[in-house]
Curated annotation (Swiss-Prot):
Residues 198-211, 260-273, 378-390 have a biased composition (Polar residues). The gene is IRS4. This is Increased rDNA silencing protein 4. Keywords: Lipid metabolism. Residues 1-61, 76-98, 187-237, 260-282, 302-350, 366-412, 522-574 are annotated as: Disordered. SMART domains: EH. The lineage of its organism: Eukaryota, Fungi, Dikarya, Ascomycota, Saccharomycotina. Positive regulator of phosphatidylinositol 4,5-bisphosphate turnover and negatively regulates signaling through the cell integrity pathway. Involved in rDNA silencing. Residues 400-412, 537-546 have a biased composition (Acidic residues).
Length: 744
């Protein structure tokens, strides 16, 4: 006979230690009881009383734990493998089927008897392991040391083990075995039983407490069997409710929780805390309260940081310490700062208007002059004292300025957009302190330099044109919308220059965006090159410096509001064009100086020739050799040549070698051809070519003034190769024709 299923056997075998000994004792007691019932063949089945019971019954079954006779008349008989009824505790061979009709089978109750015997044996074994407690009706499970619950996953595993052991065929185990199994599956659980007084009774049966035990003494059994009833299924073993309580909070967590609850306001406590649970109902596993930290709560930032004042930059203070106490006005008492409670509110929103007047800072326009800023603003207690003192100081300065500047009126500041006007007062010649007052708008620096008076400039340097405006992409120039000025100055409000004069001294405050002219580079045709509002009519050198974009269309708005049309030829950059910033891209390894290179070198020659020649010992001396003729193109001093060539950052020995190769006069000067060839050799060295031992005649012919031997009509060096091919083709055709005519 199988007493347990394989799953329950595995669960029991997994237990070790003291729990394993209890399981072995329970198993032996259950096997002995079943063997005793299986061997006896009785007509009227009787259950022998337990060792501690002196009372038995021949008419029915007796509960060995409670000592009561159980009524089994309404129970169905157990069927065998062949469909026969079996007596309770008997076999098919020893029982007559005819006599079973009057009796009642007790096969369904056999496992209960075995479980009761196993529970009693386990209780005796348990008493030897754990000493009983001082309470009379205390359960031995309550004497167990309290265990902590590891987590929610252990709680679920405990419930699974309970449902497995108490359902279906798994209900053979006793209460102690179930508890031991739970301990094996969940070693960190805290298990307790309800007291007997809290157990509910049913309609047909009741849980029997230890006081109703027939022994009359104190019964430490934790298991009481129901007498029967419709509410309990016949295949289940009903045990007292087991409550698994979660682990208590640690001391540190309790301290943090108590501290947070004490510091919270009553309104917050009413929201966060919940009413105490009802103790009248069944005890259920309660989730431990979450420990709220100051960082996680919504109101904790304001409550914990209430003593922190709002940050502000202290305003500068004028040197009032130099003034006497009589000159200072009485400053009213400033309102105190807001209390910290105004910032710590969970229900009210945090409003920026709660700042006091001490946090109000002064505008930048009121503090423009650097003279108003002083040191020692720490003397003021708050910002209101500083602001009031700042107003007094400004009023005194205004009064002093008005006394000194009575001769200046607002009518002197007259603005004109196109022309510069000068006004002189008709006064006598004896009055030398007559003021010349005028205002100029859109003036150039050349005009300002022609003003016959002392000029004082105030303001920053003119803004240079940034690279993103100087070098715009071709797509931006082609597809930009009409009227789009980008990040540059607005056309409607052009920058102006104002001049204030007094006593023959002019004060110039300029905000003009001046475009500086670069050397040896053409004017780029970008959007900011020739704006009409940036050019002045009375400026004499405006067209010479900036030039005029005559090919481009007028910039007045047209009828179409779409994309602006511009000529592609003016905006696109051709790859074949020479880039002065990157000359190596247009370099071709040829054995002579090209026409383009010769023109660039001649520009350097013209701008630096015939300079510092008086440093030569023979230049102003009348006894110099007449054989030294000065050419028409002029000469260049060797010191000037060295200065120009040194800008290439080539080694000095390389430059000396180049100078020796091109020097033909041997008198400390170079002529035009020598200078141009020397510049070409410097560029060849920068391109990575080695210096030749001797210069080819073709190089000297290419830099000659008339260029006789070098065909420089076509700039493309591949032109000669193509012409040769054409000549060869023509010659081949002529040869073929001659051969045909000769054959004919």
């Amino acid at each position: 006979m199988r007493f347990r299923s394989e799953r329950q056997s595995k669960i029991l075998s997994a237990s070790n230690g003291e729990a394993g000994e209890v399981h072995k004792a329970s198993l032996k007691a259950a096997q002995a009881t079943f063997k005793k019932h299986a061997d006896g063949a009785r007509v009227n089945p009787r259950v022998p009383s337990a060792p501690g019971n002196s009372k038995g019954s021949m008419d029915g079954l007796v509960d060995p734990i409670a000592g009561l006779q159980l009524d089994v008349s309404g129970r169905r008989s157990k069927r065998g493998l062949v469909g026969r009824s079996l007596p309770p505790g008997g076999s098919a061979n020893n029982i007559n089927p005819r006599r079973i009709s009057s009796g009642v089978s007790c096969g369904e109750y056999d496992y209960k008897v075995a479980a009761a015997a196993a529970a009693r044996a386990a209780r005796n074994e348990n008493e030897s392991i754990w000493p009983p407690t001082n309470a009379q009706h205390a359960s031995p499970l309550l004497a167990l040391p309290p265990l902590k619950l590891a987590g929610t996953h252990t709680r679920s595993s405990s419930n699974i083990s309970m449902s497995t052991l108490t359902s279906g065929n798994g209900s053979h185990l006793s209460l102690d075995e179930i508890i031991a199994t739970i301990k094996v599956n969940d070693p960190n659980s805290q298990i307790s039983l309800k007291p007997p007084t809290s157990r509910r009774s049913t309609q047909t049966g009741a849980y029997l407490s230890s006081r109703e035990s027939p022994r009359g003494g104190v019964d430490n059994s934790t298991e009481s069997l129901p007498a029967g009833g419709s509410q309990y299924s016949p295949g289940r073993l009903h045990i007292p409710p087991i409550v698994i309580n979660p682990a208590l909070l640690g001391k540190d967590s309790q301290a943090i929780l108590a501290c947070s609850e004490s510091q919270a306001s009553p309104s917050h406590c009413s929201e966060t805390t919940s009413p105490p649970p009802n103790t009248d109902g069944p005890v259920l596993p309660v989730r431990p309260p979450a420990v709220s930290s100051p960082i996680q709560s919504t109101y904790s930032f304001r409550s914990f940081s209430s003593n922190r004042m709002p940050r502000r930059i202290p305003p500068p203070c004028d040197p009032l310490s130099q003034l006497t106490k009589n000159e200072q006005k009485a400053v009213p008492q400033a309102a105190p700062l807001l209390e910290s409670s105004e910032y710590s509110g969970g229900d009210s929103d945090y409003d920026g208007k709660q700042y006091s007047k001490a946090c109000i800072s002064e505008t930048d326009s009121a503090l423009e002059d650097d003279d108003d800023f002083g040191s020692g603003y720490e003397n003021f207690s708050n910002a209101e004292d500083y602001l009031s003192s700042q107003d007094d100081f400004r009023e005194r300065n205004d009064n002093n300025d008005n006394d000194d500047d009575d001769e200046l009126d607002d009518d002197n500041l007259v603005e004109s957009e196109n022309d510069a006007t000068m006004e002189q007062d008709s006064q006598s010649d004896d009055d030398t302190e007559s003021a010349k007052e005028f205002t100029v708008a859109n003036v150039s620096y050349s005009t300002l330099n022609k003003i016959p008076m002392n000029m004082t400039y105030r303001g920053t340097l003119p803004d240079l044109i940034p690279n993103y405006q100087r070098k715009q992409s071709k797509w931006m120039k082609l597809f930009k919308r009409h009227g789009q000025t980008g990040l540059g100055p607005s056309k409607n409000h052009p920058p102006t220059s104002h001049i204030y004069t007094q006593n023959d001294n002019a004060l110039v405050q300029s905000k003009l965006h001046v475009r500086l002219k670069t050397t040896m580079r053409g004017i780029l045709n970008d959007s900011s090159s020739s704006e009409p509002h940036q050019l002045s009519d009375d400026s004499e050198d405006s067209e010479e410096d900036y030039g005029s974009d005559r090919n481009s269309r007028s910039r007045s708005p047209g009828r179409r509001s779409g994309k602006k049309r511009e000529k592609i030829r003016q905006n696109l950059r051709y790859r074949n064009s020479f880039n002065e910033d990157k000359p190596w891209k247009s370099h071709l390894d040829v054995g002579y100086v090209t026409e383009r290179e010769r023109k660039r070198y001649e520009g350097m020659w013209v701008s630096n020739r015939d300079t510092y020649l008086d440093l030569l010992p023979w230049w102003n001396n009348g006894n110099y050799d007449e054989t030294r003729e000065v050419p028409e193109d002029g000469l260049m001093l060797n010191l000037v040549v060295t200065d120009i060539w040194s800008r290439s950052n080539l080694p000095q020995d390389t430059l000396a070698q180049i100078y020796d190769m091109v020097d033909t006069r041997r008198d400390g000067t170079l002529d035009r051809n020598s200078f141009v060839v020397g510049m070409w050799l410097v560029d060849q060295s920068l391109y990575g070519r080695k210096l030749p031992r001797e210069l080819d005649r073709r190089v000297w012919d290419s830099v000659d003034k008339y260029v006789i031997n070098v065909n420089g009509s076509n700039k493309n060096p591949k032109h000669h190769h193509r012409t040769r091919k054409k000549l060869l083709k023509k010659e081949l055709k002529l040869i073929k024709k001659e051969s045909k005519s000769h054959n004919v």
